[in-house]
Each structure stands twice: as structure tokens, then as C-alpha cells.
Regions:
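Serine-dependent amide/ester hydrolase catalytic core
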Residues: 1-44, 95-97
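Structural helix-boundary/capping segments
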Residues: 31, 43-98
Length: 98
């Protein structure tokens, strides 16, 4: 299964206290912690997942998705993510971070 890693592409680092961090999602400011739901649903089900790059946002920051596999199929999940990353052109470093 392929699903979001987070509700937004990569974002600039925020060094404020965790409880003070926010992100814009569809132009609505939301607590950063809410974004962990995407990863949390998978982790709480004890399913293996592997995040892979899919390109860069309009801001030039990485966009990623997560591949999710059946229980105890970690290697299959990793291999799938490797293959799809290869098909999509591999990881591209953002120009602001060469």
C-alpha cells in the first residue's frame, strides 16, 4: 500500500518547543503534532513502512510517500521502496541544500 507520510511536503526546520510548532496544511495553521497521525496509523498497527522520495515541491523541498507492507514483510517493503524510487528518478537533493 502507498500512503502519505505527512500532510505536507518537507518544511523548513522549526527549533521552537515541540508544542509550539505549527504547519500550514491547505492554508490552515495546524499543530505540528497532528502531522504524526500519518505515520502513527501505520506504526500503531505494527506494520512495516518505508518512506521514499517522489520529487520536489514548488518550494524545492522533498516530497515523500510511505510504502506499507504486511506484517513481517519488512524486506519486501524496503525492496518495493527501492524499486519505485529508482523508477521515479531517485532522490534529488534540494538546491538550497547541495
Amino acid at each position: 500500500m502507498i500512503c502519505p507520510q505527512m500532510a505536507t511536503p518537507a518544511f523548513p526546520h522549526d527549533h521552537r518547543a515541540f508544542s509550539e510548532r505549527t504547519l500550514l496544511v491547505d492554508n490552515v495553521e495546524q499543530p505540528y503534532f497532528q502531522q504524526l497521525m500519518w505515520a502513527g496509523m501505520i506504526v500503531n498497527a505494527y506494520l512495516p513502512s518505508t518512506v521514499f522520495p517522489t520529487g520536489l515541491s514548488a518550494d524545492g523541498l522533498p516530497i515523500g510517500l510511505q510504502a506499507v507492507s504486511a506484517p513481517f514483510r519488512d524486506y519486501r517493503c524496503i525492496e518495493f521502496a527501492r524499486l519505485i524510487t529508482e523508477e521515479m528518478g531517485g532522490f534529488v537533493s534540494p538546491s538550497q541544500y547541495p
